[in-house]
Amino acid sequence: MGACFSSHTATAAADGGSGKRQQRKGDHKGKLPDGGGGEKEKEAARVEFGYERDFEGRYQVGRLLGHGQFGYTFAATDRASGDRVAVKRIDKAKMVRPVAVEDVKREVKILKELKGHENIVHFYNAFEDDSYVYIVMELCEGGELLDRILAKKNSRYSEKDAAVVVRQMLKVAAECHLHGLVHRDMKPENFLFKSTKEDSPLKATDFGLSDFIKPGKKFHDIVGSAYYVAPEVLKRRSGPESDVWSIGVITYILLCGRRPFWNKTEDGIFREVLRNKPDFRKKPWPGISSGAKDFVKKLLVKNPRARLTAAQALSHPWVREGGEASEIPVDISVLSNMRQFVKYSRFKQFALRALASTLKEEELADLKDQFDAIDVDKSGSISIEEMRHALAKDLPWRLKGPRVLEIIQAIDSNTDGLVDFEEFVAATLHIHQMAELDSERWGLRCQAAFSKFDLDGDGYITPDELRMVQHTGLKGSIEPLLEEADIDKDGRISLSEFRKLLRTASMSNLPSPRGPPNPQPL
């Protein structure tokens, strides 16, 4: 379903390596096949990970499940409990470069970070001996998502069934992003069903190309699988948004049985991804609901800043059908935007509040879900404790206690010690999505927000008008507040300058080239 390429050295998947899993029969009677090695084995013996070294005593090895570039994956049985597991064995002799060792360590760290999520393969433990590393995980026997797609009539899912599958993939992406991770290789081959039942949960199994996010950075390498790669990956400036693009490609395939971008060569596929739009005219698209088409289009927006986040996508009416608001995780971009809001000038904060007040309920569905996720006691407002709980998650930054209070105070425009929904919206708007997805509506919203300050309707905001807007509660000199937006330095703000000010408000959460983030005390 798609060639795998990478300029990033990595252990590949829970299948023992990158590429298609190969189903094999055979019992190895408790011993793993010898990979050979000679001098390489002696060299490998010097690589130490610090993992437990009693794998053979703990597990009875069974049939081979698959293999790849770096090793094999086997079924195994826990000798003490009788539980069946999957074991990924990675050959130390093939870790000839330090980066390969770091990749194994990172993959184990990632599996530990994501442990416990219902749609991510469960990690039990990591072991090693002189020759191999063993990663013990949940055994999934329902086959790949790819195989189920191919088994469907015309290789298509019904909309209802597709939404169930896509919802699970989005939950994985949202969980990764909340933990400061980007998956980087979302494709049907990397999702397994727990069992052969039709309603079996889907499990993400391959984190070999995954990497950590560091705020303010981007990935500059090209990794992933050709059919699912996002445009920004090919431009070597990618982040968590690339996972959402890949899920958009998978959704397109689930609904129509075809790839949205196809060519005979890898370079040709890349050209299609960069230049062309998916086709929604050929059958079966005319018979597919407008909601499904709207959903796919919003995931396949070429500009990553205008693309839905994974958590936003979970709030879309099509994929949410049958799902509950409580199932929607907190969006990393919402927390990042709140953190950024504190750094804005007072006038920019005022402008965002004015913009928020112009938006209609249907435009705010995803932010309402986010507000409800943080408002644990369902009081209709977010308290300091609820905000502290939301911001205490395992983020790519670390907030000290006083900073949480500072965020609350910046967002809380009426100074009642709580954050209501309108205040929350002002601090968490995805400005670039609004501006890019519907430029006409964006223009009308900016005009409406501008009019709240332009009291005499002459097309400019003056210091006197800003002073007269009572809800700002300003004292002292007003002129300094306008300086940031007053590009032509004429002492007043035009509509064009106002719109540019709003456009500078954007999410600052971007990923790093390599390695886990160093928490940044603020």
From Swiss-Prot:
ATP binds at L65, G66, H67, G68, Q69, F70, G71, Y72, T73, K88. GO terms for cellular component: cytoplasm; membrane; nucleus. Ca(2+) 4 binds at D486, D488, D490, R492, E497. Ca(2+) 1 binds at D375, D377, S379, S381, E386. Ca(2+) 3 binds at D454, D456, D458, Y460, E465. There are 3 contiguous domains conserved in the CDPK subfamily: a kinase domain, an autoinhibitory (junction) domain and a calmodulin-like domain. The autoinhibitory domain (325-355) inactivates kinase activity under calcium-free conditions. Belongs to the protein kinase superfamily. Ser/Thr protein kinase family. CDPK subfamily. This is Calcium-dependent protein kinase 4. It comes from Oryza sativa subsp. japonica (Rice).
